[in-house]
Amino acid sequence: MKKILVVAVLLMLVVSIGAMGQQTLATVLERGKVIVGVNAVLPGFGALDTATGEYTGFDVDYGKAIAAAIGVDTEFIPLTAGERLTALQTGQIDVLLRNTTWTLTRDSKDLGLDFCPTTFYDGQGFIVRKADDINSIADMDGATVCVTSGTTTEGNLADAFRLHDLALITQVFADTEASFGAYDVAGCDCYTSDKSQLASLRTTAAIPGDHIILPDTISKEPLGPLVRHGDDEWFDIVKWTVFATFFAEEYGITQANAATFDSTNPEIRRFLGLEGGMGAKLGLAEDWAVNVISAVGNYGEIYERHLGPNGLDIPRAGSLNALWTQGGLIYCPAWR
């Protein structure tokens, strides 16, 4: 009898968690805003403009895109690397857009999270001072490396030094500001993170020109949005919002022309909401994708605005972040 009672309680708990997982869209619509977890100190991806009080960046724009798809406002919550996953798990935020790497562990049933399509393909690297004459990882035997806790970079760093049979001394800090700050005042020989983050943080150094990013890439770091596991409706909305920005770039639909774009191409017409009932399949208005592009632009426009020559100046041509038609991995499934 006792065993039956325990099983019954466990089943009720599973059902309860499943029911909670299915209500994100309804909650967002009721409150009139989507709550997005972001980085507040990473220019180009997520940063707070102290002059305006507004968040800006590549990840921030994807939060705005999700809100535009639904027709609600946004609220941005700044999170450290250590806080981000818990904030999503506990329902503090609706979606996490904070330069977070897709890994098996993070995507497993243990954490209860799901990754949406990758928005930026990255890799871990190193930033060093020019004066130290370090040209590659091979020159770092016995180096002291600053790293942020709660990230994939800790494990990748240990693996890379072990693979190259190098001695390693690490200094681990709770957040990016502290870890990069320690490096910037010569508290360690180098700092390691995703290369996009290194490019961003270099702009915040006391003397940016004193630092170089080494050519070594020691990992694959696919970055993109995360949602809670079990809410398929919300997962689909976030997933296809990302795909909408990919599709729009491929077909020349921009922030400036989205509202008036016309075509005889059946797939484009489905995208624009002119036929096919695609919006209803997601529980959204038929012109939801038009609203997304009108709000933030297509993938290329978002990239150019924050990561292009006037932003972090991370080359896109020939990279994995180019469209699939140009040799990259930015690719939208069939819009049908």
Predicted regions, residues:
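Positively charged n-region of N-terminal signal peptides that target proteins for export
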Residues: 1-4
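Bacterial N-terminal signal peptides
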Residues: 8-16
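Boundary of Sec targeting at the N-terminus
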Residues: 20-23
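Sec-exported extracytoplasmic/periplasmic mature domains
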Residues: 29-30, 67-75, 89-93, 101, ...
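Acidic, polar ligand-binding/catalytic clefts
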Residues: 60, 64, 68, 73-139, ...
